[in-house]
């Protein structure tokens, strides 16, 4: 079946087929090679892209900006403090204004409904840079990174996610693995598993792709034999620091430490994290937590010894944000 990525939204990956996802991964690989070899051609000259950030960002903003600049496009960074979004103007009205000026819009913020509304009224492609429910651009980077660090075909790669699985990373890792036929293990307290309706949707995709989906409360069982171990921060952006106490109590058994990495039984296993990570007490938040919980001074969701070890490929994963976002922009906006 033929497909056309031109002028497509990227909101959750829910509506992208396996073939389309594989195409984006292959294009990401090709664009990365072209950048490394100095043979990249610009396909987005005279294109203008708006970047709306209601949540702060390092990797997503830099990845979109560099990807666009490499391809000859212009970007405008918009945050709530420097615009009328949410103050004097609704997202619906913002969409109808920006859609007349820009060729595409990226949104990073809170509820999925907001980016869906933006896509409904903008009239141009909209890309989800992160919402509370999904992180689709991160997923493409994660799978590209796993493919680069494994000599197995995608359907033979296994990975585990440990931690709060109700968030955008838990949801998205389950979804993309289900779409691509991978072996996905989610380890979390049952109260922090993805919602039942979402899991049911992913199981339907898994039936079509041959994916294996496992949800368990046992972290060591989850990581047994896996190729990659993923985690994320235990409190998401926007949640108060006061929420840490109960979450730490719930999630401490799911901390990625050397014991967990060795429990994989796979000497080639790698550690992945979408970043930023609280792996020591050198950040403001890390210091706050260490003062309250001295046993976490050497890492919260991941320990310092794992993060600074050869297990860690999170920085290559971060670089791949730019290559995969570039593939999204080119496949959607380029006149080729």
Curated annotation (Swiss-Prot):
Modulation of this protein's activity: Inhibited by 2-aminopentanoic acid (norvaline). Activated by phosphate and nucleoside monophosphates such as AMP, GMP, CMP, UMP. Allosterically inhibited by the polyamines such as spermidine and putrescine.
Explain what induces or represses this protein's expression: During limiting aeration and in the presence of arginine.
Its annotated pathway? Answer: Amino-acid degradation; L-arginine degradation via ADI pathway; carbamoyl phosphate from L-arginine: step 2/2
InterPro entries the UniProt entry points to: Asp/Orn_carbamoyltranf_P-bd, Asp/Orn_carbamoylTrfase, Asp/Orn_carbamoylTrfase_sf, Asp_carbamoyltransf_Asp/Orn-bd, Orn/put_carbamltrans, OTCase_ArgI
What happens without the gene? Cells lacking this gene are blocked in the arginine deiminase pathway.
- pH dependence comment: Optimum pH is 7.3.
Read off the SUPFAM superfamilies from this record. Aspartate/ornithine carbamoyltransferase (SSF53671)
Q: Where in the cell is it found?
A: Cytoplasm
**Tell me, what is an example of a GO biological process annotation in this record?**
L-arginine biosynthetic process
Q: Which GO terms describe its cellular component?
A: cytoplasm
UniProt-annotated binding residues for L-ornithine: 168, 232, 236-237
EC numbers, comma separated? 2.1.3.3
Q: Please give one Gene Ontology molecular function term for this protein.
A: amino acid binding
One Pfam match, by short name? OTCace_N
What coarse category fits the chief subcellular location reported for this protein? Answer: cytoplasm
Which residues make up the binding site for carbamoyl phosphate? 57-60, 84, 108, 135-138, 274-275, 321
User: According to its UniProt record, which protein family does this protein belong to?
Assistant: Belongs to the aspartate/ornithine carbamoyltransferase superfamily. OTCase family.
Assembly and partners are described as: Nonameric or dodecamer (tetramer of trimers).
For this protein, the record's HAMAP family field holds: OTCase
Q: What else is known?
A: Proceeds by an ordered sequential mechanism with CP identified as the initial reactant.
NCBIfam families to which the protein is assigned, alphabetical: orni_carb_tr, PRK01713.1
Describe its function.
Answer: Involved in the catabolism of arginine. Catalyzes the phosphorolysis of citrulline, the reverse reaction of the biosynthetic one, yielding ornithine and carbamoyl phosphate which serve to generate ATP from ADP. This catabolic OTCase does not carry out the biosynthetic reaction because of a poor affinity and a marked cooperativity for carbamoyl phosphate.
Protein's UniProt name: Ornithine carbamoyltransferase, catabolic
Species for this entry = Pseudomonas aeruginosa (strain ATCC 15692 / DSM 22644 / CIP 104116 / JCM 14847 / LMG 12228 / 1C / PRS 101 / PAO1)
UniProt lists the gene as: arcB
